[in-house]
């Protein structure tokens, strides 16, 4: 017999994200008693195929970035339709919202409106059943803690400096538990501050908590990270590996089909891009590259996958935008070997879970990710454990909007106790082991 968890109230409001921009928060109440609350994140470098984040466009409020229309869509359009529905029927509720919107990219109601409701419904149901969210979504086998992909140095759109590539990250692949992994990252982060100071650089942090110093080249970040790993007492590659998100869609010029490294003053063809990555991977302990070529450069993706696809993780973010149609094309063409999962790129929990399932069936890894505009919401920490993804990307250990996710993962690891698994290098299950 199915438990009746009737949705009795739905309320949305405008709140602020970590960049001081408005975003949507939704509360869903079940049986007049159990509340689920979710806040929606927002990205800085967005893929052209992402679901649409509805903004008001009223320049007199928040420079046009208000979300009162999205809030109104929840309160006036979605709420009347889902009140009375059973919160356990997640797929049905998500599909109903997709139909109510009626567009391919959720531009009518806004992905920020739909996602807020979708996640709040799941949280309300979990609370009503007395289950942690990861267990409600993932069931009895949800036990894998993720390897953090921790952004500790920023360039590109996330920083005002001379580095074209957007994110330089560390992955504690040699740790034995999540708590140890987090400690290794934090220690390396603090050592990086010392390394940067010794070289005369500033140590202010960017949107995601990583340092954003005015480094001289695209390779210097890798040099200082290797030095920081060693100063923290770890072996680069064995204990802590490096991951990159160059966000090359931001560098790609569609007219000439080339990559313009404006800060470096170089233009590269797709062949030269692949060669650029191959050389860096040979020189540094890089285990993962996200968006190594642009979202529409399918030919470049094929070349990159042929060159490095068996050796390192190649993550599609702008390429796939958590979208099963885009992912299916990638699988068919044999490009990339991993997908970045961002809830707000697609806009419902159901579609997110479908994308993860499709990826896993094709032998692709899934990396659950934050956005650069975050809140104190920790849903992604529960999601990554729920689906046993094994990898999470949620910023540096230096801002509460990022640390909130790591702290939630510490709680989950403690709760799981002896059944918790930290995969380490096994998170890259589809690569040839050295």
Curated annotation (Swiss-Prot):
**Which reaction equation describes what this protein catalyses?**
(2R)-2-phosphoglycerate = phosphoenolpyruvate + H2O
Q: Which SUPFAM superfamilies match?
A: Enolase C-terminal domain-like (SSF51604), Enolase N-terminal domain-like (SSF54826)
* Gene Ontology cellular-component annotations: cell surface; extracellular region; phosphopyruvate hydratase complex
Q: Where would you find this protein in the cell?
A: Cytoplasm; Secreted; Cell surface
The UniProt record gives the binding positions of (2R)-2-phosphoglycerate as 166, 342, 371-372, 393
Q: Which GO terms describe its biological process?
A: glycolytic process
A Pfam match: Enolase_N
Give the EC class as a word. Answer: lyase
According to the UniProt entry, its GO molecular function terms are: magnesium ion binding; phosphopyruvate hydratase activity
Q: Which gene encodes it?
A: eno
Q: Which cofactor does it need?
A: Mg(2+)
Report the function annotation for this chain: Catalyzes the reversible conversion of 2-phosphoglycerate (2-PG) into phosphoenolpyruvate (PEP). It is essential for the degradation of carbohydrates via glycolysis.
Annotated EC: 4.2.1.11
What protein is this chain from?
Enolase
Family named by the database record: Belongs to the enolase family.
Which cysteines does the record link by disulfide bonds? none
């Amino acid at each position: 017999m199915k438990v009746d968890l009737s949705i009795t109230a739905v309320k949305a409001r405008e709140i602020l994200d970590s960049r001081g921009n408005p975003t949507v928060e939704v509360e869903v109440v079940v049986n007049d008693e159990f509340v689920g609350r979710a806040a929606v994140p927002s990205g800085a470098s967005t893929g052209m195929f992402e679901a649409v984040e509805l903004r008001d466009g009223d320049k007199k409020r928040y420079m046009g970035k208000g979300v009162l229309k999205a809030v109104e869509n929840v309160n006036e359009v979605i709420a009347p339709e889902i009140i009375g529905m059973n919160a356990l029927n997640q797929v049905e509720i998500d599909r109903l919202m997709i139909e109510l919107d009626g567009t391919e990219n959720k531009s009518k109601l806004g992905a920020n409106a739909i996602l807020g409701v979708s996640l709040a419904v799941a949280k309300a149901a979990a609370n009503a059943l007395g289950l942690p969210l990861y267990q409600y979504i993932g069931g009895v086998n949800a036990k894998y803690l993720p390897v953090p992909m921790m952004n500790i140095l920023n360039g590109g759109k996330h920083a005002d400096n001379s580095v074209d590539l957007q994110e330089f990250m560390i992955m504690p692949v040699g740790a034995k538990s999540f708590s140890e992994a987090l400690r290794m990252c934090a220690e390396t982060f603090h050592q990086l501050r010392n390394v940067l100071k010794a070289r005369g650089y500033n140590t202010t942090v960017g949107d995601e908590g990583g340092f954003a110093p005015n480094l001289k080249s695209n390779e210097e970040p890798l040099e200082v990270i290797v030095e920081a790993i060693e100063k923290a007492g770890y072996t680069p590659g064995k204990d802590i590996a490096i991951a990159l998100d160059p966000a090359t869609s931001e560098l790609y010029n569609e007219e000439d089909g080339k990559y313009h490294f404006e800060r470096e003053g170089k233009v590269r063809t797709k062949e030269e891009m692949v060669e650029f990555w191959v050389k860096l991977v040979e020189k540094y302990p890089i285990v993962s590259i996200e968006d190594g070529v642009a979202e529409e450069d399918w030919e470049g993706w094929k070349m990159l996958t042929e060159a490095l696809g068996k050796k390192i993780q190649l993550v599609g973010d702008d390429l796939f935008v958590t979208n099963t149609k885009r992912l299916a094309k990638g699988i068919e063409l044999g490009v990339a070997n991993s997908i970045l999962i961002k809830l707000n790129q697609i806009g419902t929990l159901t579609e997110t879970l479908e994308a993860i399932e499709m990826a896993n069936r094709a032998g692709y890894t899934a990396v659950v990710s934050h956005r650069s505009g975050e809140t104190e919401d920790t849903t992604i920490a529960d999601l990554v454990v729920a689906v046993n993804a094994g990898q999470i990307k949620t910023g540096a250990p230096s801002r509460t909007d990022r640390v909130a996710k790591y702290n939630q993962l510490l709680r989950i690891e403690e709760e799981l106790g002896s059944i918790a698994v930290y995969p380490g290098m096994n998170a890259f299950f589809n690569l040839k082991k050295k």
